[in-house]
């Protein structure tokens, strides 16, 4: 009986998948100054854990491009230390100055752009311009939120929801009832 319960518990925990985690990044007046790699740009890093797998990105942002800069020039890169990653250009089709809001999400897995972080676990973000208008500094500003979905390499098993626990406990109860009934029948 104890071996049966142990086997059932092992099976329950072995069938759970790794849990996705999210990183929500609040943006408040994050300026975009120059081309990628410029020391003037805003660069952030977040430690998500060694070899974490980046699986999705969502954004809800308001961008302002100062004339003569265009909204389509504001870019943020999401990269590993080894520079694997993606570029996000929310206003890609908007070739004008001014302010506009953009919101969307994407599964990087579904579009074949998912990537893993390096052993240092750092996700790097750089806010930059795809074309630097030298006559204006900064070229633009970001406000809103960016959300990164990822799976840590060492994610533990999922924690069952209450309904799952109830179903699992009911199953254990039935196994116990059957074992007791069998034992009474043999006595």
What are these regions (language model features)?
Residues 182-187:
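Short, charged juxtamembrane terminal tails flanking transmembrane helices
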Residues 4-13:
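Sec-dependent N-terminal signal peptides
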Residues 21-157:
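Mature extracellular "passenger" or substrate-interacting domains of secreted, surface-exposed proteins
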Residues 15-17:
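N-terminal signal peptide c-region/cleavage motif recognized by signal peptidases
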Residues 158-180:
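A short, hydrophobic C-terminal helix/tail in secreted or cell-surface proteins
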């Amino acid at each position: 009986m104890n071996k049966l319960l142990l086997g059932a518990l092992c099976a329950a925990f072995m069938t759970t998948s790794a849990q996705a985690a999210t990183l929500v990044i609040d943006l408040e007046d994050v300026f975009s100054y120059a081309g990628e790699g410029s020391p003037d740009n805003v660069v952030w890093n977040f430690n998500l854990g060694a070899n974490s797998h980046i699986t999705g990105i969502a954004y809800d942002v308001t961008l302002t491009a100062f004339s003569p800069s265009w909204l389509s020039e504001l870019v943020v890169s999401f990269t590993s230390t080894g520079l694997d990653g993606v570029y996000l250009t929310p206003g890609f089709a908007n070739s004008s100055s001014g302010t506009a809001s953009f919101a969307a999400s994407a599964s990087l897995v579904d579009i074949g752009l998912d990537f893993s972080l390096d052993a240092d676990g750092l996700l790097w973000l750089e806010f930059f311009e795809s074309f630097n208008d030298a006559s204006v500094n900064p070229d633009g500003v970001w406000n809103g939120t960016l959300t990164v979905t990822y799976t840590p390499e060492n994610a533990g098993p999922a924690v069952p929801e209450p309904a799952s626990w109830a179903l699992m406990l009911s199953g254990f109860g039935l196994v116990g009832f059957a074992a007791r009934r069998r034992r009474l029948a043999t006595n």
